[in-house]
Regions:
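Terminal and domain-boundary accessory regions
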Residues: 1-270
Length: 270
């Protein structure tokens, strides 16, 4: 029992904001027409007693004037203020510096703050379970230490974006997919966008009116993509012999979706 109030199974969520940003930006760019995703953070944090969010404001780029810089960081300042206003949420800011065009921005202090806070809450027995959202392999020693201390550690990581050593270190793990993020979106935003429509069929519903326009071939699967009247359908034959069908009106978004859902959660090298 963690609290004197008698609360059982206290769960804290620790979020690497840079990792979460990268995940959301990827889906925005590849699947939702570059629209700014509207996240209901209370949905994201459902089931957790406290949420700790760590990030930093973007560094000013070389040659960037102050007005442009202030306009560029406004959305992140707005996000930080929004998160601070939510019950259970706590925001901690590190610093960043712009190194050069090739290496881009370097984030400082955030990783250390996450490590210190997770270990502190664990050693004080403030929580029974810690969940860390990250894809950074540098956190493996922290997870190892917490597990060895008896803390139950779960890892949330972007699908295909985390090293298997990091994933294997946690007691449990969850790959963050487009379906995960869809569950976090606000109801209003869901009305503005759509995912491919899924259907299972025992027969191939493709006739001569459809034109094959592409195929996606990987080591473990092959998907054929057809078009008719600006509507696209991707056909995946299962090992049972039936067909998984995915329909969408945007070819690039459909192809990204197919590769995303059929890729392994984590890449392992033999």
């Amino acid at each position: 029992m963690s609290y004197s109030s008698g609360i059982k199974n206290v769960k804290y969520l620790f979020i690497d904001g840079g990792c979460l940003d990268s995940l959301l930006e990827s889906f925005s760019d590849k699947l939702f027409g570059k629209k700014q995703l509207e996240i209901d953070y209370c949905r994201l944090a459902n089931g957790y007693h406290k949420v700790f969010y760590y990030d930093c404001l973007p560094a000013q780029k070389q040659g960037e004037n102050q007005v442009d810089y202030q306009n560029r960081i406004k959305p992140k300042i707005k996000l930080f203020n929004h998160l601070k206003s939510l019950d259970r949420f706590h925001v901690y800011e590190g610093t960043a510096r712009f190194r050069d065009k090739r290496r881009g921005q370097e984030q400082k202090e955030v990783d250390i703050m996450i490590a210190v806070d997770m270990y502190r809450h664990s050693s004080r027995k403030n929580m029974d379970e810690a969940t860390l959202l990250t894809s950074d392999l540098d956190f493996k020693p922290l997870i190892d230490a917490l597990v060895q201390e008896g803390m139950y550690v779960s890892l949330w990581y972007p699908k295909t974006k985390a090293n298997y050593e990091l994933v294997d270190a946690a007691d449990s793990r969850q790959a963050l997919t487009v379906y995960t993020v869809w569950g976090w979106l606000t109801e209003d935003f869901r009305k503005k966008v759509s995912l491919p429509i899924f259907e299972k069929s025992s027969l191939l519903p493709i006739d001569d009116s459809w034109t094959q326009v592409d195929n996606i071939e990987q080591s473990t699967y092959e998907v054929f993509v057809y078009e008719k009247e600006n509507n696209y359908i991707a056909v995946f034959q299962t090992i049972e012999g039936d067909y998984n069908l995915y329909q969408h009106n945007n070819l690039d978004q459909l192809k990204f979706f197919i590769v995303h859902i059929h890729s392994p959660d984590v890449i392992r090298y033999s």
